[in-house]
């Protein structure tokens, strides 16, 4: 799949980041992970991100990273494209991107470089080196200390033909509006805030109708229902789900730092697709929080 094909795929539909399965010792469980992807693939996501943020990318060793990507590619071959997370320091990001390409992934999401702050000039060079190291499509993840301004993006799209997407987790609507108005259809634009459904309508209004859904991991039917309602301007359905499910979900998520991932793994366990524990420094939900989440999920009915 070339970069343009990937751009077309991620320009429409719902995206998701499967959690990464660990056994009770905290080791990667390839068999369980493959079953998870086989369960999720038929629900209709346009692409799945392996080893993304929700997939605990930050906690994977080099060998585990390769195992996760290979398992995802093999499990979803012929059914749904796999986009691999890749990031950290520039040379590490390059090695991961090249490994993902070698293993058959269809592109990468370029994760933040972590810790150190960087100038726009430094970020441009970072992205450029990663893009130049591979042939497939690259989606830039705009968040944390890794945020590009419009001028920097303009430079990159002119010099990196395989930079095909911009995923925003900043929540800065004015910035996103300027990016979309300036670059037009040169890039695909993805919403990437936690519990993205809450922000999906304003992002759609400014020209970014695609987003990645964390809840697709445990309520895929409802996640697709919400996306289709949003796509069809079914305001009554989106508002009902926001009021009755997503706002209460956010209240549980906000009880502890790191619950954005822990809650998703708990949800998967509740619906019968246990992915094992999260790895430190994350912590699993408390028993009370787990019970509250289970009660909330039960209101949605079978998935």
Curated annotation (Swiss-Prot):
SUPFAM superfamilies: Aldolase
Enzyme class: lyase
Pfam family, one: DHDPS
Pathway: Carbohydrate acid metabolism; D-glucarate degradation; 2,5-dioxopentanoate from D-glucarate: step 2/2
Reaction(s) catalysed (UniProt annotation): 5-dehydro-4-deoxy-D-glucarate + H(+) = 2,5-dioxopentanoate + CO2 + H2O
SMART domains: DHDPS
Transmembrane intervals: none
Keyword presence, rRNA processing: no
InterPro entries hit by this protein: Aldolase_TIM (IPR013785), DapA-like (IPR002220), Dehydro-deoxyglucarate_dehyd (IPR017655)
Highest taxon above the source species: Bacteria
PANTHER family, alphabetized: 5-DEHYDRO-4-DEOXYGLUCARATE DEHYDRATASE 2-RELATED (PTHR12128:SF19), DIHYDRODIPICOLINATE SYNTHASE (PTHR12128)
Database matches in HAMAP family: KDGDH (MF_00694)
Entry's family note: Belongs to the DapA family.
Protein name listed in UniProt: Probable 5-dehydro-4-deoxyglucarate dehydratase
Organism: Acinetobacter baylyi (strain ATCC 33305 / BD413 / ADP1)
Upper taxonomic lineage: Bacteria, Pseudomonadati, Pseudomonadota, Gammaproteobacteria, Moraxellales
